[in-house]
Amino acid sequence: MVVSAGPWSSEKAEMNILEINEKLRPQLAENKQQFRNLKERCFLTQLAGFLANRQKKYKYEECKDLIKFMLRNERQFKEEKLAEQLKQAEELRQYKVLVHSQERELTQLREKLREGRDASRSLNEHLQALLTPDEPDKSQGQDLQEQLAEGCRLAQHLVQKLSPENDEDEDEDVQVEEDEKVLESSAPREVQKAEESKVPEDSLEECAITCSNSHGPCDSIQPHKNIKITFEEDKVNSSLVVDRESSHDGCQDALNILPVPGPTSSATNVSMVVSAGPLSSEKAEMNILEINEKLCPQLAEKKQQFRSLKEKCFVTQVACFLAKQQNKYKYEECKDLIKSMLRNERQFKEEKLAEQLKQAEELRQYKVLVHSQERELTQLREKLREGRDASRSLNEHLQALLTPDEPDKSQGQDLQEQLAEGCRLAQHLVQKLSPENDNDDDEDVQVEVAEKVQKSSSPREMQKAEEKEVPEDSLEECAITCSNSHGPYDSNQPHRKTKITFEEDKVDSTLIGSSSHVEWEDAVHIIPENESDDEEEEEKGPVSPRNLQESEEEEVPQESWDEGYSTLSIPPERLASYQSYSSTFHSLEEQQVCMAVDIGRHRWDQVKKEDQEATGPRLSRELLDEKEPEVLQDSLDRCYSTPSVYLGLTDSCQPYRSAFYVLEQQRIGLAVDMDEIEKYQEVEEDQDPSCPRLSRELLAEKEPEVLQDSLDRCYSTPSGYLELPDLGQPYRSAVYSLEEQYLGLALDVDRIKKDQEEEEDQGPPCPRLSRELLEVVEPEVLQDSLDVIQLLPVVLNSLTPASPTEVPFMHWRKNMLAFLLTWEKLKRRGRGRKEGEEDQRRKEEGEEKKGKKIKTHHAPGSAAC
């Protein structure tokens, strides 16, 4: 019976095939992997066989040493790498341990500093409360003793907080004894400390003598420092370092004997050579030994070269074998295997290198951290040391204050001074224990504490402190009050040395002074800070006010002279009663020079403009009239700034200040009036140039009115001097005579100008002859004015000063004469230039008229022709 295969049977067959395939695929992969492993093993077997054949061929016994040497070098290299890694790991571990220990120590030191700061602040507050009590009865008797005992207890607590941990147990007994002695207050603290400090020194000396086996005793007076003792016997070096750590109370000393690494003891090696032959045989042996010693390095070098050649040959043979095997076993099939091996090796090397770099970076970071922590530890240890020293000194001071030798000194002013010294030591301690970033926060507290201490101290110290702590606002108010004061003061008050330098909107002043009416060193300095060379000037030394003013005048431009000339300076070598007068005349001389320069500059600008604009005289004069007030305003501002100098005079110069003020006003008014007269004349000439005689007559009629006003001002000047008291009698007469001569000179100048104008108004028909006559007559007229000017010094020199204080007035007169002479010269120069221009213009007009006449003569003749 035959059964035909149906669809169900075919489907089952397909499912079976798929299942079989799925089962056989892992087996196929496994077989492939086994085949690759077999290939690798075969390859290695062939390589081993090749090496064995080569070794047999090249006599393996000869190459055995070379193979061992190569293997030994490779092993040594691996061991060195491993040792280096272990060394780095150990060093890293040590640094980690060191960092953690330093962190713990830093935390402890910071905590100790914080506790010390709190204790020092509480002690400072306690001392401040003790120094400035609310009820004065509590500062005497038993209450004072109890409060001082509390202060000593706080100071001891502070010393305990600042002491290291290893000294706390050692200081407990000493502190208990000190507490008992403080309460009993039987003996001074200094004597007790001297007795306590002798005992550990003697024990230390005995210990040092026992340890070092020294033959002589040490000097007990010398301080104990780090002692280093070295014994040398038969080339044996042993070192002991005796480290003395003194306790913070100065009463206990500890000895730490630390071993210092050095060479171990070893017996002396003695080599004896017994000669058995004559001397010649010994010499021959010595020569042979020397030759052998010389040839040994050469032999070793040759052996090394031979080994290197063998290695190169062996490597070449292995490379040749690998190339043949790759060709034999189809290099393409083994290519993936070789690449994977090389890739794994490279990856392994990169991982090793990355790990080494990571360890090196971590080690570097730890080193940096260790160094920074070492620096911080050094700073904190130094701060703790300074704090301990300050706390000890404060403790000793309080102990001495609590147990005085003389009971009378513990009351009254001496007690206050001692308490103030204790407060100062406490403040110094707080400052030492405060970190650098907390210094700014503690400044306000220190200032308040200093004010409290100074209030309770002597009046002299309080006055000095107030003068040092005056702010800039109060300084400016003081300067304004001094400069604006006009009321009379007592002239019998002693004159102090005063150095004041004013600068507009550029002065940032600092007041330094001391209240002393007898010493010459009590002075008020107002020092400018706006210059960039202040530090260099301070290094060079103090600069005199005169030199300072001259340097400022050189640097300041022309427009800022009004600031520089308002400076009041006083030489330090003059007397106090004479300084105020000399400073006043010094500034007055500078104002006169400034005014003369301004007038000369104004005249010179006027002459230049007339030269440039000779073709349009009316237009040029109108422009000049418009521009003149600006130029004159500058000079007038400088002139009117002169009286501000007189406000800085001292009390004894108060009567003269008003007189100089009036005189300066009259002189400025006269100068302004003369400028107005000249401008008025120029305007009249411009308005009507065709009729000069009529305009000049009108001007002559109007001039007396204007001049009368100026003369009234001038003659009203001496009235200001009549108000001077009897103290200024000699100065009043001198100034009065000077004013009369000054007015006479002004009248002479006006009369000369009038005569010149009258001669010009006559208008002679021949201009050439008139010019020659003018040149002849003019020197006589000017000679008259010069005679008047030259007579003034004779009159002034005849007035001898009645007292030394009249010398400044004589200087002022001479400067006034110099100013007048300069003014007259400038006027003559301007007038001569103006007349020359007028002559040139007249010549040009005459030539034009002649040309017109010639043209008119030729014109009728040509018409007739």
UniProtKB/Swiss-Prot annotation:
One of its GO terms (cellular component) is cytoplasm. It is found in: Cytoplasm. Residues 165-181, 530-539, 550-562 have a biased composition (Acidic residues). Residues 161-200, 450-475, 520-567, 829-865 are annotated as: Disordered. Its main location: cytoplasm. Expressed in spinal cord. Residues 165-259, 436-528, 529-617, 620-675, 676-767, 770-865 form the Olduvai domain. Residues 70-130, 339-401 form a coiled coil. Keywords: Coiled coil, Cytoplasm, Repeat. Residues 190-200, 833-850 have a biased composition (Basic and acidic residues). It holds the Pfam family Olduvai. It comes from the Eukaryota. InterPro entries: NBPF (IPR055306), Olduvai_dom (IPR010630). Belongs to the NBPF family. Encoded by one of the numerous copies of NBPF genes clustered in the p36, p12 and q21 region of the chromosome 1. PANTHER family: NEUROBLASTOMA BREAKPOINT FAMILY MEMBER 1-RELATED, NEUROBLASTOMA BREAKPOINT FAMILY MEMBER 6-LIKE PROTEIN. This is NBPF family member NBPF11. It comes from Homo sapiens.
